[in-house]
Amino acid sequence: MQVDHSTIYRWVVAYSPELNKRCRRHLKSTNDSWRVDETYIKVKGEWTYLYRAIDSNGNTIDFLLTENRDAPAAKMFFLKAFGHSDSRKIRVINTDKDKAYPKAIKELKELDILPDSVEHRAVRYLNNIIEQDHRYIKRRVIASQNFREFKSASRTISGYETMNMIRKGQIQNVDRGDILGQKKFIHSVFGIAV
């Protein structure tokens, strides 16, 4: 059977958000030390911003593609990330020196969404681990020769990020490097007989 690459791309755009949703309930817990950063992604020839958070062990917490790089975008990202993680368990958030982060974190503390006890450290070298983690996603984006639409970019990146979480061994009972276990897991969440 031959399948055209554009058909596969349509499947990726259609099913990536569903894969992410179904994988979330099977993720191992992350720790209380977050690394947050954003990286640039071109969509329609314009720069957009992929916000990402991982814990100090390199486990992905969440991601969000936005059109802006500012405090409201950072706040929106944190709110999304807190939806997938208990914000009451966070001890420290490490970021680069982007001025949007302190403002967003301050607003979230004022709204009592983030505890006052959470420490914010704006120290560039503490984020080396997330800068390295960006590489996997950036390689996929470059291989896809950038994106033509924001919605399809967001959905495709969701697939890249979800597969990266599976690859890194973040799924319960599926180890890093266990390709067969990863395949069985994906089949099981979609109800496909192996």
What are these regions (language model features)?
Residues M1-V194:
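Residue-level recognition of single "structural anchor" positions
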